[in-house]
Amino acid sequence: VRLKIFNQPLGVLLIFLTSQIGFSSRVAKAQTQVAPTTSTKSICSTQLGTAIDAVINRPLFSRVRWGILVQPLSSGQTLYSRDAQKYFIPASNLKLLTTAAALQQLGANFRIRTSIYQNGNGVLRVVGRGDPSLSDTQLQTLAQQLKQKGITQIQRLIADDSYIQGDIVNPTWQWEDVQSDYGAPVNSFILNQNIFSLKLVPQAVGKSLQVVWTDVGEAKQWRTINQSVTVAQNQPSYINVTRELSGTVLRIQGQLTTNSEPSLIDLPVVDPNYYFLRRFRTALATEKITLGQTLVVNGGVNQEEIAFVESPPLSELLMETLQNSNNLYAEALLRALAGEKPRVKTKTSVDVGLEAVKASLTQLGVDPANYILVDGSGLSRRNLATPEAFVQTLRGMARTPAGYVYRASLPVAGKIGTLKGRFQNTSAEGIVQAKTGTLTGVVSLSGYINAPKYEPIVFSIIVNQSEQPATILRQAIDEIVVLLTQLQRC
């Protein structure tokens, strides 16, 4: 669950079923953390090993697994290596593999199309193809196109969700992740990132918090049990949200102070196809188009296309995927890879997409033995990859014509994306482009460095099995990266 508090910090505890979840530690997309300020200096490549060892061999990390590989971008010469060919849970660094394959196989200008076909007799068929950027704005555009065609009434609207085959939620994802906005379902009809919101508004002391739904239609799908309360200004604030396995009951507990700003809670939809149809009915109504029966089917024949919208080009989708570590986008791109392949009845879209990733990475020179993938985002703990896999991918992509698009999609140290709050006022600021990753006990960072006194560098650093807070691990990783930016030939 993504919970936003405006103007005032709020201590939050989100509870799903009977388990308490520290949601910030579960997210595959990495959080930002400011690195310690480091003065600019130089280090010889021959001294690098000793300097890195001094960081990772601290007693603080005695129980931690480190995987590190540092090489010049232009060659396979190793500047530093530690368990670089052993498996680690990569977290969101895995997105580097998914996006590399998508860019190679689909091309930077690839777009995902959502179409409406006229099948005659007042029947329209809408075909979703898993566009993760689709929003209410695009639904309104579709409704306007239908109005321009002279359509004022639709007797039946058929939603064909056959484009993406298989489970809408990866079965290897953990339950608490599935209940959070970063674990939203992935299907043919993704709308508003398959997330809905509700706002909790403080009232007079002793009164329940007011629950305000941003989507009145969505409110009708839930039974809400509100056990929250408004408290005096000197009291702590916290919110407990319980969602039952059936997905039909929301229990709201906890308290906000009377002077608190409203809190906005994002939750994943549980019926994305029908969520799409409900929202589309609303869009049609604003154009004075009446809609009769709606139906979800898997397959069918498309006739004349009378309306469509398209996603931004893949080059822009990659930026959202990598810079903001968007899980939904990464999973949608994995399925887009499958959509361009012949359909196999016995395989899901994820199966086919992962095969496409493997084929693409092999062409880039990545050893297939260096990874085991089960999703496209890195949210699953069953994903395994070696630091060498990421270095091989980064180097391979740098040699392709689309390498500049790939690199431009990455967060930039101290400037952009999930690295915006890290490396500020260090020698790494502005010259490191890298992908972050975070799960509980896992922190990773892999990317490129334009070392000012050395040739360009490619690196991968992965930490697993750690009991230390992610902030501590990031600071250590950042120290190592700063060392790499200070490399010079001696």
Map each language-model feature to its residues.
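A short glycine/serine-rich beta->alpha loop
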Residues: 83-88, 266-267, 377-380
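Short active-site loop at a secondary-structure junction
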Residues: 81-101
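C-terminal segment of classical bacterial N-terminal signal peptides
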Residues: 18-27
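A short, well-structured edge-of-sheet supersecondary motif
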Residues: 56-82, 296
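Conserved serine DD-peptidase/penicillin-binding transpeptidase domain
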Residues: 29-43, 47-50, 54-56, 105-367, ...
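Small-residue-rich helix-loop
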Residues: 79-81, 334-490
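Bacterial N-terminal signal peptides that target proteins for export
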Residues: 1-11
